[in-house]
Every structure is written in C-alpha cells, then in structure tokens.
C-alpha cells in the first residue's frame, strides 16, 4: 500500500483546483493532508476533502518550507507557476503543473499517462511534470493507439471548446449572457472574459494570434502532440469557443501511412485506456458535451473512413476538459509518479 502523501493545491479555489479535490477522492489517491493555496483574497475561505475542512492559505515563497508537502499541483496560471514552482521543488516536492509555462521546456516531461507514462522518470531533472493543454490530452489519448497500429503522419483537428476552458469566469459570463438574452438585453451585454459575446455565438479565437495567424491555443496542440508522441507529426488545428458550459469536442481527421480498417480501428479504440466508444449513428448515439460532463473518460464516436482516401479516418471526440483535460490527468500523473517512486 502506498504511503499517504501530503498534497498542496495551488489555485485551490479555481475550477481546476476544486475538481482536483473531487478527483483525488474519487480515484482514492492516498492523501495524508491537503494544503489549499491561493491569492490573499481567498485566505480564510475553506475547501473540503473527504468530509474535512481545510482553510485556504496564501501562496508565498516560504509556504512550502513552513508546510512540508510531497506533491504540489499548480493550477493558478503560468505566471504563478513561473514564480512559485521552484520553491515547492526546493522544499523536496514534485510539482505537477497544469499551466502552459513549463510544457515545452526540454527537461520537463509532458505527460498523458495513457500515452507516455515512461516519460515521468525524467521528473528528477527539474522536479516538475507538466500537464498538457486540455484539448491536446483528449486528442492524443485517441491518436496514440491508432498511431501504434497504422502509423500516423498527419492530423487535422477542429475544436469546439466550452466556456469553462476560460475558468469559472468563462462559465459565469456565458450564464450571464444567456440571462441577458432571455431578458431581451443581449445587445447591451458587455463581455469581459471573451472578445465577443459567446451566447448564441461562436468565436474562432482562443488565446492570442501569433505571427503566422494561428492562435497560441492552436500551436499548443501542434507542439504538445509532437512532444507527447515523440514524433515529428504534421498537425493543423482550428480552435473555436462555443456556447457550451463544460466539455470540449473535437472533429479529428487522421492521415496514416497504411490503409485503415475501420472495424479494426473501432476495436483498437474500444480497448484503449480511458477511452469509451459511443458509435451507433443509425440510432443517433454519439458523444456530446452534456453526457460527458463530470466524467473522467474520453468519448469517441462518428468513426468513419474517408470517402476518397482509404488512408484517412475521421472521428468525433468529446471529454470534460476540467477533468480529463486537467484534474484527472494530473491525478493520474501523480499515481504513476508514486508507482515509480515506490519501485
């Protein structure tokens, strides 16, 4: 039985921080204690874990010295990780970082446990393990087993990303915009989190535009997929924010070196870890955001061959990005790290 771990959660009052507590409980992770950390404005508030209340403390440079911990989950933004992760590492903890700050650093493993758990062994180089972007995680969980079988050479993906990808503020803004719509005042609504009103709308921009006219979010999917799969894979992404509260959806087109047997591809995906196939289009059965919200799996459907090219496969992929795309993946990393540590 694994030794119980002292856990710190940086960003404990945010959407991912709150979900981390739920997932740690559900996956029965061996927890001795919880140290919830946040900014000064949240100090004094409480979070609950397994029926016990823990007071939120302020994140400072000395808090990890004063409160020794084993694992620190960081989910409070890249600038916070940049400033404070080193203090957790110096105190002897492993940092599992949910932000984008460390992902592409050479010596920091970028891990999806279903795809590249072997990379966790490199954590000692920096004391940090990076959690990939939410939209990347669900995609590579599907790509990995198919790549192993058919040798993937290119991926084209269009995402349909929920408001909660922008945190609690994103969810709240969508709800308020819909309330404005039902009050016949949507034209008066002023968005703060998104560049435009999201209610009844689609926004083909997530994060800032780069010099090549791709957004930062789109390039994350390109670069992170290549790093996780250890393959110089061609990836092109178009990321769109949609008026859905929770769960990201993706339409994925995969180009392979070999001809695809769709029946075999479905069987491979049915056996893939953390993947659930819902694919019965004649009976209108396929994954959707509402059915996948608050779950820990990646759902796949609409699996079909290309009409023109036998080396191309199309599918539809949906997952709760707060869980699969952040909290659940982070806890699964911690589980694998603990297994490795105990060997």
From Swiss-Prot:
Q: Is the Oxidoreductase keyword given for this protein?
A: yes
Q: In which pathway does it act?
A: Amino-acid biosynthesis; L-lysine biosynthesis via DAP pathway; (S)-tetrahydrodipicolinate from L-aspartate: step 2/4; Amino-acid biosynthesis; L-methionine biosynthesis via de novo pathway; L-homoserine from L-aspartate: step 2/3; Amino-acid biosynthesis; L-threonine biosynthesis; L-threonine from L-aspartate: step 2/5
- List the catalysed reactions: L-aspartate 4-semialdehyde + phosphate + NADP(+) = 4-phospho-L-aspartate + NADPH + H(+)
List residues binding phosphate: 103, 220
Matching entries from SMART domains are given as: Semialdhyde_dh (SM00859)
- One Pfam family, short name: Semialdhyde_dh
* Superkingdom of the organism of origin: Bacteria
EC number of the protein: 1.2.1.11
HAMAP family recorded for this chain?
A: ASADH
What name has this protein been given in UniProt? Aspartate-semialdehyde dehydrogenase
């Amino acid at each position: 039985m694994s030794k119980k771990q002292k856990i710190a959660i940086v960003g404990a009052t945010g959407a991912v921080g709150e979900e981390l507590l739920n997932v740690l409980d559900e996956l029965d992770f061996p927890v001795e204690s919880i140290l919830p950390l946040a900014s000064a404005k949240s100090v004094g508030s409480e979070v609950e874990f397994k029926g016990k209340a823990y007071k939120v403390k302020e994140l400072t440079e000395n808090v990890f010295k004063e409160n020794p911990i084993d694992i620190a989950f960081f989910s409070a933004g890249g600038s916070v990780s940049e400033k404070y992760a080193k203090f957790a590492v110096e105190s002897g903890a492993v940092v599992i970082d949910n932000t984008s700050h460390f992902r592409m650093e050479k010596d920091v493993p970028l891990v999806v446990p279903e795809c590249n758990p072997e990379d966790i062994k490199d954590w000692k180089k920096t004391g940090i393990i990076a959690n990939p972007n939410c939209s990347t995680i669900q995609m590579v969980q599907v790509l990995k087993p198919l790549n192993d079988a058919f040798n993937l050479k290119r991926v084209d993906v269009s995402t349909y990303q929920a408001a909660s990808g922008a945190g609690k503020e994103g969810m709240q803004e969508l709800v308020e915009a819909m309330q404005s719509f039902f009050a016949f005042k949507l034209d008066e609504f002023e968005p703060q989190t998104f560049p435009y009103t999201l209610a009844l709308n689609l926004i083909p921009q997530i994060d800032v535009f780069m010099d090549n006219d791709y957004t930062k979010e789109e390039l994350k999917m390109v670069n992170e997929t290549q790093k996780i799969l250890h393959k110089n894979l061609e990836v092109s992404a178009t990321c769109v924010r949609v008026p859905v509260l929770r769960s990201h959806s993706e339409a994925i087109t995969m180009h392979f070196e070999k001809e695809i047997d769709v029946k075999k591809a479905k069987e491979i995906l049915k056996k893939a870890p953390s993947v659930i196939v819902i694919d019965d289009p004649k009976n209108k059965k396929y994954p959707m955001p509402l059915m996948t919200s608050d779950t820990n799996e990646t759902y796949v459907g609409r699996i079909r061959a290309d009409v023109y090219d036998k080396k191309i496969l199309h599918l539809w992929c949906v997952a709760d990005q707060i869980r699969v795309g952040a909290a659940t993946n982070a806890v699964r990393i911690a589980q694998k790290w603990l297994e490795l540590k105990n060997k």
